[in-house]
């Protein structure tokens, strides 16, 4: 049995470019990815460059709260 909190946690990454873009236009949604991270190796918020189908380019996806 595992003790305490799990080391690996599920996090949600959200596109930072879609937020700024959808202010003037109708909301087309926000690109989100689900991944896991190791709490011991990366205690801070995770930021990765991923492809955003809404922006049609690679943008920074940042971790959000659940």
From Swiss-Prot:
One family name in Pfam for this protein: Ribosomal_L33
Cell location: Plastid, Chloroplast
Chief subcellular location: plastid
Gene Ontology CC entries for this record: chloroplast; ribonucleoprotein complex; ribosome
InterPro entries: Ribosomal_bL33, Ribosomal_bL33_CS, Ribosomal_bL33_sf, Ribosomal_zn-bd
Domain of life: Eukaryota
Cell membrane found in the keyword field: no
GO biological process, one term: translation
GO molecular function annotation: structural constituent of ribosome
Keywords: Chloroplast, Plastid, Ribonucleoprotein, Ribosomal protein
PANTHER family in UniProt: 50S RIBOSOMAL PROTEIN L33, CHLOROPLASTIC (PTHR43168), LARGE RIBOSOMAL SUBUNIT PROTEIN BL33C (PTHR43168:SF2)
Family: Belongs to the bacterial ribosomal protein bL33 family.
Protein name: Large ribosomal subunit protein bL33c
Organism: Glycine max
Gene symbol of the encoding locus: rpl33
